[in-house]
């Protein structure tokens, strides 16, 4: 995963340096020294599918990324850390993009607290999208993610179909398909 860090203050830049030490190849950029607009920088990160770490307020991060957010299955992961390094928050693409895991790694590196808010994580239950990612499966009916997750969180048995071909599914059933076949 390529990681780009954006900072807005000297303290933020110092914290970014601590983070960079744990992630080889991480780029750190100070907003005032970008040479392009914050919007153009953010567009570039999304286009390159880079993970974005914002050292600053969540509000700044939300305003930065809002025009570029399109799909939970393909958006760049976005993590926010306050400039003191106290809290590290996965803001976008927690499971499929890896923002939750990245937030935990960053928090471990800087001595911060990861603030994970995804329901399956806080309830310590099965996450179907994380399962799909780890097993190399693609989700072909994305509307099934929320329905299956809700069933799991309610203690009900979910309906999941794993098939080599896309099939028509009843509402509330999640369809998964292998990304590649190994013979």
Annotated model-derived regions:
Residues 96-183:
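Internal alpha/beta core interface subdomains
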Residues 27-34, 53-56, 80-81, 114-118, ...:
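General beta-strand structural signal in soluble alpha/beta enzymes
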Residues 12-15, 60-64, 99:
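Short glycine/serine/threonine-rich phosphate/pyrophosphate-binding segments
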Residues 18-24, 67-73, 96, 131-132, ...:
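Short, solvent-exposed amphipathic alpha-helical segments in soluble enzyme
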Residues 1-2, 48-51, 73-76, 83-86, ...:
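Short coil/turn connectors at secondary-structure junctions
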Residues 1-28:
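N-terminal basic/disordered segments at the start of proteins
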Residues 69-94, 101-105, 109-117:
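Short, acidic/small-residue loops that bind anionic groups at enzyme active sites
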Residues 41-61:
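Short, structured active-site "lid" loops
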């Amino acid at each position: 995963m390529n990681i780009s860090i954006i900072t807005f203050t000297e303290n933020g830049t110092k914290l970014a340096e601590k983070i960079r030490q744990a992630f080889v190849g991480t780029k750190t950029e100070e907003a005032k020294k970008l040479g392009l607009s914050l919007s153009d920088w953010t567009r570039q990160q999304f286009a390159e599918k880079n993970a974005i770490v914002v050292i600053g307020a969540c509000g700044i991060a939300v305003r930065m990324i809002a025009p570029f957010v399109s799909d939970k299955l393909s958006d760049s992961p976005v993590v926010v850390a306050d400039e003191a390094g106290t809290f590290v928050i996965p803001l976008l693409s927690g499971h499929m993009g890896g923002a939750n895991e990245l937030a935990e790694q960053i928090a471990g590196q800087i001595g911060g607290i990861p603030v994970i808010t995804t329901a399956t994580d806080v309830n310590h239950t099965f996450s179907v999208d994380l399962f799909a990612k780890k097993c190399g499966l693609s989700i072909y009916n994305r509307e099934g993610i929320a329905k299956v997750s809700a069933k799991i969180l309610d203690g009900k048995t979910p309906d999941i179909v794993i098939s080599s071909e896309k099939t028509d599914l009843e509402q509330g059933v999640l369809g998964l398909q292998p990304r590649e076949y190994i013979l």
